């Protein structure tokens, strides 16, 4: 009887802990911060911070110092190459964000505004026209060696 009670109590505690971890936004925020780089200056970190907004950049130095205290044994000072990569990523992110805002005015944009908001880097690079852009569909088949739809086969 005691064994059943212990198993039930352990199961209830585990379920409560897992459900509170899933539903608690602060736990989710901590988990997403752990996914990011501890260095703070690599390209993915800089681009992610920029795309999420400037508000988090205000507290970036505080977070870096907190990370330094928490992870003194594994903290790595960013190199010049990482700083250059962060600057490049930040410039690409800025261009992507600006071109996303100007999607309606972009002459080569074929994606919808919804697609642009899902992937802002789509707008960073101009879309290339297809090599067969001006060729009517019926002539494409002839160019590829198939039978033209308006010709008849006589055997």
From Swiss-Prot:
Keywords: Host cytoplasm, Host nucleus, Secreted, Signal, Virulence. InterPro entries: RXLR. The keyword Secreted applies. A motif (RxLR-dEER) lies at residues 49-64. Residues 1-17 form the signal peptide. The keyword Signal applies. It comes from the Eukaryota. Transmembrane segments: none annotated. It is found in: Secreted; Host nucleus; Host cytoplasm. GO terms for cellular component: extracellular region; host cell cytoplasm; host cell nucleus. Its main location: secreted. Belongs to the RxLR effector family. The RxLR-dEER motif acts to carry the protein into the host cell cytoplasm through binding to cell surface phosphatidylinositol-3-phosphate. Secreted effector that completely suppresses the host cell death induced by cell death-inducing proteins. This is Secreted RxLR effector protein 38. It comes from Plasmopara viticola. The gene is RXLR38.
């Amino acid at each position: 009887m005691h064994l059943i009670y212990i198993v039930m109590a352990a199961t209830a505690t585990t379920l409560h802990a897992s459900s509170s971890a899933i539903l608690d936004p602060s736990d989710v925020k901590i988990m997403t911060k752990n996914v990011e780089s501890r260095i703070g200056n690599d390209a993915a970190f800089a681009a992610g911070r920029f795309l999420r907004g400037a508000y988090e950049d205000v507290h970036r130095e505080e977070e870096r110092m907190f990370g330094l205290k928490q992870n003194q044994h594994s903290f790595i000072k960013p190199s010049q190459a990482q700083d250059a990569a962060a600057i490049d990523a930040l410039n690409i992110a800025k261009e992507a964000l600006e071109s996303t805002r100007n999607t309606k005015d972009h002459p080569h944009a074929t994606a919808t505004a919804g697609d642009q908001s899902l992937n802002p880097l789509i707008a960073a690079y101009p879309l290339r026209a297809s090599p067969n852009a001006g060729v009517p569909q019926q002539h494409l088949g002839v160019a590829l060696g198939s039978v033209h739809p308006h010709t008849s086969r006589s055997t």
